[in-house]
From Swiss-Prot:
Record's compositionally biased regions (Acidic residues): 411-420
Region (Disordered): 376-439
Annotated function: May have a role in glucose regulation.
Catalytic activity: L-seryl-[protein] + ATP = O-phospho-L-seryl-[protein] + ADP + H(+); L-threonyl-[protein] + ATP = O-phospho-L-threonyl-[protein] + ADP + H(+)
Protein's UniProt name: Serine/threonine-protein kinase SKS1
Miscellaneous section: Present with 2810 molecules/cell in log phase SD medium.
GO terms, molecular function: ATP binding; protein kinase activity; protein serine kinase activity; protein serine/threonine kinase activity
One Pfam family this sequence matches: Pkinase
Active site: 186 (proton acceptor)
InterPro entries hit by this protein: Atg1-like (IPR045269), Kinase-like_dom_sf (IPR011009), Prot_kinase_dom (IPR000719), Protein_kinase_ATP_BS (IPR017441), Ser/Thr_kinase_AS (IPR008271)
Name of the encoding gene: SKS1
């Protein structure tokens, strides 16, 4: 119906969302080709006038959406489908007082979002265009929300590290809001957008407040994610000993957002809600949980680790709920989300990886985060291996010192033994052979050997020494034979057989 309508330099391409008092469109800047989302917030006075004029009521969501589309279409048509609207200075919106915001309630959402949008995981407002029937808010565009990714795409089924990344980014954004005194009050998957790199962005501050304490008789947000103290029907009940209708004004607002985070964590890990409403009289499951929190382990496939964290988040008494910093730390340290399946083992994220690669890097891919986590584990393994190598080297050094001491002691014992005049040599098997002279001149063998049965281990490979000694033995034998023959010639006369033949 509104396709191709021009809003200043933005061309409307499609409607991507709707609410009680507004519509959301996908637009393209015709000058830069950049995509944006434009939220159209209708002024309550114009809506009441339109309903009264047509005799209609706004009870049906479909009826409301149709009426909003029709009214906006006629508005564009009256200007030939081209609107040129003035842009409101964003700084001037931040300067609006509380009284001025009360007179311009549709600007309260804009002012709160502008105040906190410096965080990297909160959707940013770029322009605010004003008309007589509606205010147009130009914001960042992301093509999917957390609800679609969880339920329709099953995007988190096998990715424990991705669950940590998205959940911690959401916690960080919400913690930033709380520190600046803004409480969202409508945390749910539909209000969390995701980019192509699976980074999360908090949006829709339409129900947010600056009040630190709950306003009496006020019930806001989706019943699936609302804390029990925020539900209107709890006003006549007691919550863990606290009578809500008597001290509703003293109950903190921020802990209600933390409760909603706990339900989202269950959505991410189990793809379901634990109950329809956190009300003991209207929801049987929640009533059983209020009596015994172990019911969570019976209805959900969660691990003991995750159960421990959830019991700290889903405290019925808002004053005893876990704080944001502790929650972020404990989720970072979880090693499992479920008892079985791919989420039964989840990498631990160190504070360095979390601060550097989750919060500060908006363009981080999941593969990069897995790589950082794997590098951390690899570094730990390398450190363990280096420590083992050092221990082995130290053991080897001690062993060498002991061997040297033993060798030195053995050498000293050998040096203390008397030296023998008998020549010796070594056989190929390492045993020592001793040679002794004899006085038998008639025996052609002048040397006899006796074998020492004990091998000399230090020279067991010295084969060449044995061969040299044998050669010397043969040479000495030949010389002795010659001397013997010469001696017989001198005593018995010449032997003709011995004389050379001339």
């Amino acid at each position: 119906m509104l396709s191709d309508c021009l809003l200043n330099n933005f061309r409307i391409t499609a409607q991507i969302g709707s609410g009680a008092y507004g519509l959301v469109f996908h637009v393209v800047d015709i000058l830069t080709s950049r995509e944006y989302a434009v939220k159209t917030v209708f002024k309550s006075s114009s809506m009441d006038e339109f309903y009264n004029k047509n005799g209609l009521n706004n009870n049906s969501q479909v009826a409301r959406t149709t009426l909003l589309q029709t009214q906006l279409y006629h508005f564009f048509k009256s200007f030939q489908k081209k609107l040129f609207l003035p842009s409101v200075d964003l700084d001037s919106i931040l300067q609006l007082t509380e009284n001025e915001l009360n007179r311009l309630p549709h600007y309260r959402e804009i002012a709160f979002q502008l105040r906190v949008q410096s965080h990297g995981n909160i959707v940013k407002i770029h322009q605010v265009l004003e008309s007589s029937i509606a205010t147009f808010i130009v914001m960042d565009y992301y093509d999917r929300d957390l609800f679609t990714s969880i339920v329709d795409d099953k995007h988190f089924v096998n990715h424990g590290i991705l669950i940590k990344k998205v959940f911690l980014q959401l916690c960080s954004a919400l913690d930033h809001c709380h520190r600046l005194g803004i409480y969202h009050c409508d945390i749910k998957p539909e209000n969390v957008l995701l980019d192509r790199n699976d980074n999360a962005y908090l949006c829709d501050f339409g129900l947010s407040t600056k009040s630190k304490y709950l306003a009496p008789n006020v019930c806001v947000g989706s019943s699936y994610y609302m804390a029990p103290e925020r539900i209107l029907y709890c006003l006549n009940t007691t919550t863990n000993g606290i009578h809500v209708d008597e001290c509703c004004s003293s109950l903190p607002t921020d802990t209600g957002d933390i409760w909603s985070l706990g339900i989202i964590l269950i959505n991410l890990t189990c793809i379901r809600n634990p109950w329809l409403k956190a009300h003991q009289k209207e929801d049987n499951t929640f009533q059983h949980f209020a009596n015994d929190n172990n019911v969570l382990k019976k209805i959900l496939p969660i691990s003991d680790e995750l159960f421990t964290v959830l019991t700290k988040i889903l405290q019925l008494n808002p004053y005893t709920r876990i704080d944001m910093k502790t929650l972020m730390s404990e989720v970072s340290s979880l090693t499992s989300f479920t008892r079985e399946g791919p989420l039964s083992q989840v990498p631990i994220l160190s504070s360095e990886v979390y601060m550097t690669h989750i919060i500060r890097n908006e363009n981080l891919f999941l593969s990069d985060l897995s790589h950082f986590s794997a590098d951390q584990e690899q570094q730990q393994q390398q450190q363990q291996q280096q420590q083992q190598v050092q221990e082995q080297e130290q053991e080897q050094k001690q062993e060498q010192i002991q061997n040297q001491e033993q060798a030195q002691q053995q050498q000293e014992e050998e040096d203390a033994e008397p030296e023998s005049d008998i020549p010796s040599t070594y056989n190929s098997d390492g045993s020592m052979e001793k040679y002794e002279y004899t006085n038998n001149h008639n025996n052609s063998t002048f040397l006899t050997s006796s074998m020492d049965s004990t091998p000399y281990q230090s020279d067991i490979d010295d084969v060449s020494a044995s061969k040299d000694c044998k050669f010397q033995q043969d040479t000495l034998r030949n010389r002795l034979l010659c001397l013997q023959m010469n001696f017989s010639t001198l005593t018995d006369g010449p032997n003709e057989k011995w004389l050379p033949d001339y």
